[in-house]
Regions:
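Conserved beta-strand core positions
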Residues: 20-22, 47-51
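Short, glycine-/small-residue-enriched flexible loop/hinge segments at domain edges that mediate gating
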Residues: 25-28
Length: 81
């Protein structure tokens, strides 16, 4: 669980660096990635996630989020716009 805790904190901190809206879709749930509590209740390593990124720094946010998800072995794709 400690590894998952580190992933949640780092994902939320990374997302907070960007002004874009970053929403994680996990099946039928949508979670603001800047919300540590939302991530704690949703993030599991064996699930596929989809990120929806909208805003002025969306391209940088997408790259940063993919990097941090991959670092923690989490399966994520960017949703088509």
């Amino acid at each position: 669980m400690a590894k998952n805790n580190a992933a949640v904190v780092e994902i939320a901190q990374t997302a907070s660096r960007f002004s874009s809206s970053i929403v994680l879709q996990a099946e039928n749930k949508y979670i603001d990635v800047k919300s540590i509590l939302g991530l704690f209740t949703t993030l599991v390593s064996n699930q596929q996630y989809e990120l929806h990124v909208i805003g002025p720094d969306a391209e940088e946010a997408k790259a940063g989020m993919i990097e941090v998800f991959e670092k923690h072995g989490l399966n994520v794709v960017i949703a088509p716009e």
